[in-house]
Every structure is written in structure tokens, then in C-alpha cells.
Amino acid sequence: MFYQENFDVIVVGGGHAGTEAALAAARMGQKTLLLTHNIDTLGQMSCNPAIGGIGKGHLVKEVDALGGLMAKATDKGGIQFRTLNSSKGPAVRATRAQADRALYKAAVREVLENQPNLMLFQQAVDDLIVENDRVIGVVTEMGLKFRATSVVLTVGTFLGGKIHIGLENYSGGRAGDPPSIALASRLRELPFRVDRLKTGTPPRIDARTVDFSRLQAQHGDNPIPTFSFMGKTSDHPRQIPCYITYTNEKTHDVIRNNLDRSPMYSGVIEGIGPRYCPSIEDKVMRFADKNSHQIFIEPEGLTTHELYPNGISTSLPFDVQIQIVRSMDGFENAAIMRPGYAIEYDFFDPRDLKQTFETKFIDGLFFAGQINGTTGYEEAAAQGLLAGMNAALQSQGKEGWCPRRDQAYMGVLIDDLSTMGTKEPYRMFTSRAEYRLLLREDNADLRLTEIGREFGLVDDDRWARFNQKVENIEQERQRLKDIWINPNSDHVDEINKILKTPIAREANGEDLLRRPEITYKLLTQLEDFSPAHIDTQASEQVEIQVKYQGYIDRQKDEVEKSLRHETTKLPFDLEYSIVKGLSNEVIAKLTDAKPETIGMASRISGITPAAISLLLVYLKKHGMLKKGE
């Protein structure tokens, strides 16, 4: 039977991609349905209890700038906050938070249940309803059918999921949850390229059985950062430390002696695992020269004894896992509460996606999260928000949108995936972006919030706060420009005391702030430049904008030059074989990838500048170039 109401957008899956997708569509005024096999696991942290990090924190800030949930939920659930790379330049500084799993999940659930235009329903989805190459709804496991204009699949590791512990394996979406077998089979019938990936998780440890006096404590930052641009430190629960221990030669001997019982090394697992989060057996074999590996001991929450030993993800048998854990300092008597395991699952080649996350072969069907070959909560959330937003735009009959590579790490993410695809779980790093200085954590709102407001993603409170911040930055920069100091000024001696070289000519506040020895805080403590009446977010922007203005302007010039043909559209059905001068290799690669734009085509391996020139000549000859391109 069909459900009595129709929906604009249906989201399948309630993880980090699904929750952001559903909330985005609902915020944009679309009647949205979120289907999940278990409402109690909405927003669950399936792996490590942490959000953010290098590149990942940038994505979280961008999701937040567009009105998303992840940063706010982290502020409410975060039990330790740190700024990574704090001594380096602003482009690579990143926020990372340990989270209380229960508090984080509760924060997500509360927002979902109170979001207008959003309905939650507990049922697994077994089938899609497709007519004339367009999705029009879904079928649940009990046969109930739902109609919608757009469907977003955010199914994580559940598609054909298989869990491995030693040489034993069984079907599962994650520990304790069933897999999506019927839906996986249905998707394999559609014209998508599909493959298998693998990820893993470590055994969880009972903190009561650990000798913390043998471990190195790692405390969070003080003052405590916030993740959301709307956040405040009073949102945070009690803060607690993490700990550090190390593997040793005994650990490594245990692993080497049991490789014949490893599903990875015995050929049972065929899926490729994450390069930047390898299992402990992988680390021991790949880095045989290392005598030890650092292990971060992360509390799972304030009201549980469970610990997450970040760095010993493993699929070795349980008896071997016990030996590995007890070989480490402080863990000689440790008890395991949950065994570690590996999981294999289906993913779909993201080159079969448009940059809006809509599939190229089935209209109205969007993919987001691990189904696209990514790894990580943050990557999933970013994809989910954009997919949900574009599904909503489609249901409104409007053109889709995604940020460019110079606008957001989100843009880098979808461009990398849809242009180059991936053979291993894709993780975001700052090194993947060409314009890192423009894509900082601190300016994510300045880059994206206005765009989010135009699409209906940003509410009135955030919009008012954003406009006040922009006004504060502009006013403070103007104030500094208007204050002039010369060698004969009354307080020049006070200023010269903190300068490496005394003032030799007239200078204003911004001139002084550009000096490497001067910080905004130091400058505004001087009599001529105090007091400063702006908050930390605005003052941080003033300092970065002034100190790095030359470099920022240079990157903006580079962007302007590269954009000339970046967004020039290529017809989906273009016959590349009739474009004169293209080699057979180039024709094959372009035909396979079906790039949407000249910019995407230029980033495909083996596509030369000469080939791009030939494409532009062809487009111009056939009247496909807009004026000025």
C-alpha cells in the first residue's frame, strides 16, 4: 500500500549524512521524510567518539555556516576541545572535539524531532520505485510505499554489509544492526558501477581495568573553543582528558604471529580499507621499522566506563585482541567490553554522480556519505547537507548548486569524487585544496552563510548574528585605518617598546598589525588603539585579514584567472569521438567520466591542456559557449 501523504524529499538512513540531508530539505520548506531502520540510532557515532581534525574540522565549520547541525551537536556533546596546528598559519588550524556519544546523539535527536516539515519513520527500505529512469518513491521492508519527488540514499556501511572478526564473518550493517541486503541487490540492478570497501573499529575497553597512572594525560585547550559560529562555552558539558599509550615489540610480535588468522592477510576481505586510518596489523606490516605506534585513549562519555583506543582498529580474532590490548603499558589487566571488527560494504563509483550528488542515470536519486566511497562523519555530513539541499531545489523545480573548489572544502570534496572517483575510502585533508588560505575554518561563515540564506538554509538568528559580525569586522578595520601614529606622537615610546624596529614614518593601526611581532590583542592594549569592543570571532578575522591580505589577494587573483572556463558546461551526451584532434585515450577517458564542465574535464588524469583547447574550439564552433567565455 501507498502511504496516504506524498513527500517532496525522502531521505533513507539516519546517520551523519542522512540527518543533515533531512534537516536541510526541511529547513528549505520541503515536506521531508527521514526513514531509518531504528530511530534510537539517529546520529549515532559508529566509530570513534570525535568530530573534526585537519580538513575535517573545516568541513564541519562549512556545514555549520550553511545552517547544519553537526557543530552545534558537538558543542552540546563535546567533552574535550582542541585546536590542532595552533602554532601554524590560519589555513591549517583545525578544531577537534571528543564527544560524549550519548549527549551527541541526544542533541541530534532533539533537533530532528522539533524540525518543522520533517517526519521521522522507523522502517528499513528494501526497494526504490523507478519509472522512466526517474525515482518516484521507496518501498519499506513491510511493503509500505512512500512517494516523493526526490530520494536521498545515505545508507553508510549497510549495503551488503559483512562483519569480520578473525576468520568468522556474518552479515551486518554495523555491530548490532542488520545489513541492507535487498536494497543492495536492487541498486546493483541499476546502471551504476559498484565495488567493495572496508573499514574497521578497535575493541572497546573497560576504564575500570586500566592503570591510568602509567598513561600520559592529554588535556583540552583553555579557553575552550566552540565548534559552531553560534556556539558558546556554556553549551559544553564537563571537560575531561584523553590519554596516550603506545604499542611495543610484544604487541607487534603478537600481531605478526597471528597474521594467518587475519581476514585481511588471508584473503577473506577483498575490500580496500582507509589509507589514513589503517588497522593495527596493517601498520605493523607496512611500517616494520617502527618499534611502537602511538595510541590515543578516548573516553566514550561522561557516564560510561567505555574507552575507545584510537589506533588499534583490528579484525583479528578475539583471543588475539585480548593479547594485543594487554601488551600495552597500563592495559596489562584490561577487559574488553566490545570486540573490534572489520566491515565490508558496497559503494558506488562517485563518477556516476553530478556535482549536485544526483545520479547521472536515475533522475531525482541522490547519494551521500559512505555510499560514495568516503570515510568519516564530517565528509558524510557535508555531502548530506548538499544532497538534501539539491534534492529540495529539484522538488522546487530549481537548478541545483554546489560550491566551487575555491569556495569551500565541500566543493573540493564533490569535485574530487565526481571527477576522479576513488578506489579507497576518501578522507578530506587541507592538502587537497589549491586555495587553502581562502578556505580557512575561521571564515567559513563569511564564505557560505549568505549563500545559505539565499537558499533558505539559514534561520533568522544565525543571519542576524552573521550580519553583526560582518559589521563589527568592517567597523574595526576602519577604526584601525583611521588611527595614525608618527615618530612624534604622544605615545610613540609605548608603541616602540613592543616593536622590533621603531616607527620611522607615519603608520596607521593596520600598518602596525601587519608587523609579525604585533598581535591584535597586543595592539588594542596600547592607549591609542584601545578599547576594542568586538568579540573573539570578529577580532580573529580582523587580524587574519590584515596580516595575510597580500597573500589572500594573490590567491583571489589566481582564482579569477582559473574561473574563466571552470564552469563552462559540457553537454552530457557530447560525442567526444567527433571532436577533431582528440586522441583515442582522451576520447575514452572523457566518454567514461562524462564531465559536466571544462573545469572537471581538466582535472581528469591524462586530459592535457591541448585537449581542453580542442574542446573549447568545438564548443565555440557549435555555439555552445556563452558570451565572454
Swiss-Prot record:
Residues folding into a coiled coil are none
As for subcellular location, the record says: Cytoplasm
Gene Ontology molecular functions: flavin adenine dinucleotide binding
Coarsely, its chief localization is: cytoplasm
Family assignment from sequence similarity? Belongs to the MnmG family.
Please give the function described in this protein's UniProt entry: NAD-binding protein involved in the addition of a carboxymethylaminomethyl (cmnm) group at the wobble position (U34) of certain tRNAs, forming tRNA-cmnm(5)s(2)U34.
Name of the protein in question: tRNA uridine 5-carboxymethylaminomethyl modification enzyme MnmG
Give the species this sequence originates from. Answer: Photobacterium profundum (strain SS9)
